[in-house]
């Protein structure tokens, strides 16, 4: 297999403010694996939170590309990708996820099967995705919520964690009034302490919020589990549930775990977490980083396995360089085409 990569800028339509930062753009590194005239693609995006810049991602993807060159075909490379003793093991999960994406895309094209078929789903997956509304003024949030509801969105996720919690309550009230029939998720991104969370959770429950992601600062999963046992709302671990061992510690102790492929290491790792938590009382959420359609697509092929879907990262972009998973009407869909089913907007379809 031959490999090449390209680094691109992904600009957001408008800056997205969350409790710990405001983001207006991020870089993405695209991996292109070629074998016998077919191409498979993967994407890794930069993350200040996880300490990944474009140079680091490019270096690590290049190292993995050198390793991949030693395999006769993508199928054998995919089998070896999860080997803990392989050269380069221990690289950031985002890199492994991008390599796995490219291999799955390539294997699907070689076999004529879409990725969801490779993963055991007989039918093309589709699901209502949440759409994120950042920390902003209530009237701005209300206008956005009304627009999204009119376009078909049935799930909205409102960011929280303002210095004054009253501002978050006002924002959620405004969103609820503008879109009374949508399901509401809330995400403080770890901004609350235990006492604040205990005070606020009943108030947000009264506003019709369905579930809350990561209310407490990450690093104390025992405290999160303690809060979940007392909460009137389902709590979904995100920053406290990075990989399999984190999920194992929290299974049955929180109501949900937000699995992001860039956080856990890809589709295979996500499936292992889903199997681990099944039947424990902890449900699966599929989330994402802000990324292009290429970066979101692998998770869309898993969308039938989750209770909550938050795969809107590509919808936040001013220009998504890839297409193939929908989402603008509130529903993401896996294509029935071989592989990931995505293609570049600026190019003719490649094999």
Per-region residue spans from a language model:
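Metal-dependent enolase-superfamily TIM-barrel catalytic cores that perform enediolate-based chemistry
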Residues: 117-231
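Conserved, mostly hydrophobic/aromatic
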Residues: 31, 37, 99, 112, ...
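Catalytic alpha/beta core domains of metabolic enzymes, predominantly
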Residues: 219-312
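Predominant activation on well-ordered alpha-helical scaffold segments within soluble catalytic domains
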Residues: 62-65, 96, 100, 104-105, ...
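Metal- or metallocofactor-binding catalytic centers and their adjacent structured scaffolds
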Residues: 21, 33-35, 39-110
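Short, P/G- and charge-enriched loop/turn segments at secondary-structure junctions
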Residues: 15-20
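Flexible C-terminal active-site loop/helix
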Residues: 1-3, 7-12, 23, 36, ...
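Hydrophobic faces of well-ordered beta-strands that scaffold small-molecule active sites
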Residues: 40-42, 127-133, 154-158, 184-188, ...
